[in-house]
A protein has these predicted regions:
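Short beta-strand-to-coil "C-cap" segments at the C-terminal boundary of structured domains/repeats
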Residues: 243-248
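Short, small-residue-biased leader/transition segments that mark boundaries at the very start
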Residues: 1-2
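Generic recognition of flexible, low-complexity loop/linker segments
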Residues: 8-12, 37-41, 75-79, 112, ...
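A structural signal for beta-strand and strand-to-loop patches characteristic of beta-rich domains
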Residues: 116, 120, 126-150
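Distinct, well-ordered alpha-helical segments
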Residues: 6-15, 191-193
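Carbohydrate-binding surface patches
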Residues: 157-199, 205, 241
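Catalytic-core region of carbohydrate-active enzymes that cleave or remodel glycosidic bonds
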Residues: 13-16, 20-130, 184
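Acidic, Ser/Thr/Pro-rich beta/coil linker or hinge segments at domain junctions
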Residues: 196-237
Length: 248
C-alpha cells in the first residue's frame, strides 16, 4: 500500500484548486538546511507558489548562533535561486520579551530597557537590504591551499557548506553577490563579472564572520573594494560575504 503524507495531499489539493499561494512552515537543525539546498529546485513551476511563512534553524540548546544564522543564509540563497516558486519568506518567531518567552530561538530579544538583535537578525537584514528582482545564474569553483574541490561525491560534504547567489535590482541597477562559507577554513573563489561591468568597478563589501558558536557576531563595517571583470576572492571561515556592485 502506498501512503501519502498530509503535505503531499495538501499540495495536490492546492494545485487542483489552483490556489495562488501556499503557506509553508518548518523548523529544522542546521544540517537539514545544509543538505536541502535543492528543496525547491524540483517544485512545479507556473502554478501554486510558496509563502515560507515560518522557518528557523535550531541548533544545540536552540540558541541563535553564527552556525544557525549561516545555515539560514544558505537556505535564503536557495530561496533567491527559486524566486519563481518562492514568492515571500519570513523568519519566525520575530520578537520575544525576556522572561515572557514561549520558545527559542527568536530573532530579536528585548526587555523594558534593552534590545538584543541576534546573529540571525543581522543575516536577515543583509538579505532584505540587498534584494533584487532578477536572478543571475552563478557557479563557484572552490580552492583551498591550491587544492580544487571538484563537483563530485567525494567533495560533496565540502561543497554543501558553500553557497552563492547573484540578484539584480532593476531600479537601482545594482547587482548583489552573496556568498556563504560554512567551512572552517579560508576558501578562494573567482568572481567573473564578464560583460556586466566595465574593466573595473568600485563595489561595497560587507562580511559577517566569527566563532561558529558566537551569539553576538555582527557584520564588519562595509568597505569599498575594486573589482575587475575577473577577481579572486578569499572568503573567511564561517562567513557571509555580501558584495554590492553597481552595473554599467
Amino acid at each position: 500500500m502506498l501512503f501519502r503524507s498530509d503535505y503531499e495531499d495538501g499540495w495536490a489539493l492546492a494545485r487542483e484548486l489552483k490556489v495562488p499561494i501556499v503557506d509553508e512552515h518548518y523548523y529544522q537543525a542546521p544540517g537539514w538546511f545544509i543538505n536541502h539546498q535543492d528543496f525547491y529546485d524540483t517544485y512545479e513551476r507556473g502554478g501554486t507558489r510558496v509563502y515560507l511563512g515560518e522557518y528557523a534553524s535550531h541548533g544545540n540548546g536552540r540558541a541563535n548562533t553564527l552556525e544557525t544564522a549561516l545555515t539560514e543564509a544558505v537556505h535564503m540563497i536557495s530561496l533567491e535561486r527559486n524566486g519563481d516558486v518562492v514568492a515571500m519568506s519570513s523568519y519566525a518567531p520575530l520578537l520575544a520579551k525576556e522572561g515572557h518567552k514561549n520558545w527559542d530561538p527568536d530573532l530579536i530579544y528585548f526587555d523594558n530597557n534593552n534590545i538584543w538583535p541576534t546573529v540571525g537578525y543581522h543575516v536577515q537584514k543583509l538579505f532584505s537590504n540587498n534584494a533584487g528582482d532578477r536572478y543571475a545564474l552563478t557557479k563557484a569553483n572552490l580552492l583551498n591551499d591550491g587544492r580544487t574541490f571538484p563537483d563530485n561525491d567525494e567533495f560533496a560534504p565540502f561543497r554543501k557548506r558553500f553557497a552563492s547567489s547573484c540578484v539584480i535590482d532593476s531600479k537601482t541597477n545594482i547587482a548583489t553577490v552573496k556568498i556563504a562559507n560554512l567551512l572552517g577554513f579560508e576558501v578562494k573563489t573567482t568572481l567573473k563579472l564578464d560583460n556586466l561591468v566595465p574593466a573595473s568597478v568600485n563595489a561595497t563589501k560587507t562580511v559577517l564572520t566569527g566563532d561558529i558558536f558566537s551569539r553576538d557576531a555582527k557584520p564588519d563595517t562595509p568597505e569599498s573594494v575594486t573589482l575587475d571583470r575577473t577577481t579572486e576572492l578569499t572568503l573567511k571561515p564561517f562567513s557571509l560575504t555580501v558584495l554590492s556592485i553597481p552595473l554599467k
